[in-house]
Amino acid sequence: MKKVLFLLLACTAVAFAAETNAPVEQEAINVWIKAFSVLAAGLGLGVAALGGAIGMGNTAAATIAGTARNPGLGPKLMTTMFIALAMIEAQVIYALVIALIALYANPFIVLQ
C-alpha cells in the first residue's frame, strides 16, 4: 500500500511541476467545444424534426378520423389541426434557433 501511495504522490508532483501553456490548452478546449457543439446541434435538430414529424402525422390522422366520423365538424377540426400544427412546428423552429446559437454564438468558447 505504501508503494502505491508513494507512486501516486510522485506522479502528482511531476504533474504539478510541469509547465503549462495556457493559450494552447484553451485552443484545444475550444476545438472540442466546437466539435461537440456541431454534434449536439445536429442531433438535437434531428430529434426535434423527428418528433415534430411524428406529432404532425398523428395530428393529421386524428383530424381525418374525426372528419370521417362526423363530416359536419370538418371545418372546426381543420382549424384546430392547423393551430396544433403551428405549435408543433414552433417547437422545431425553437430547436433550430438553439442549434444555430450553439454553432455560431457559443457562449462556452473563450476568446483570446
From Swiss-Prot:
Coiled-coil parts of chain: none
UniProt record similarity statement: Belongs to the ATPase C chain family.
Residues the UniProt record annotates as site (Reversibly protonated during proton transport): 89
Keywords: ATP synthesis, Cell inner membrane, Cell membrane, CF(0), Hydrogen ion transport, Ion transport, Lipid-binding, Membrane, Transmembrane, Transmembrane helix, Transport
Assembly information from the UniProt record: F-type ATPases have 2 components, F(1) - the catalytic core - and F(0) - the membrane proton channel. F(1) has five subunits: alpha(3), beta(3), gamma(1), delta(1), epsilon(1). F(0) has three main subunits: a(1), b(2) and c(10-14). The alpha and beta chains form an alternating ring which encloses part of the gamma chain. F(1) is attached to F(0) by a central stalk formed by the gamma and epsilon chains, while a peripheral stalk is formed by the delta and b chains.
Main localization of the protein described in the UniProt heading: membrane
Subcellular location: Cell inner membrane
GO molecular function: lipid binding; proton-transporting ATP synthase activity, rotational mechanism
Function recorded in the entry: F(1)F(0) ATP synthase produces ATP from ADP in the presence of a proton or sodium gradient. F-type ATPases consist of two structural domains, F(1) containing the extramembraneous catalytic core and F(0) containing the membrane proton channel, linked together by a central stalk and a peripheral stalk. During catalysis, ATP synthesis in the catalytic domain of F(1) is coupled via a rotary mechanism of the central stalk subunits to proton translocation.
Gene Ontology cellular component annotations, sorted alphabetically: plasma membrane; proton-transporting ATP synthase complex; proton-transporting two-sector ATPase complex, proton-transporting domain
Designated name of the protein: ATP synthase subunit c
Membrane topology (UniProt): Multi-pass membrane protein
Parts of the chain that traverse the membrane: 36-56, 81-101
Keyword Mitochondrion: no
NCBIfam families: ATP_synt_c, PRK08482.1
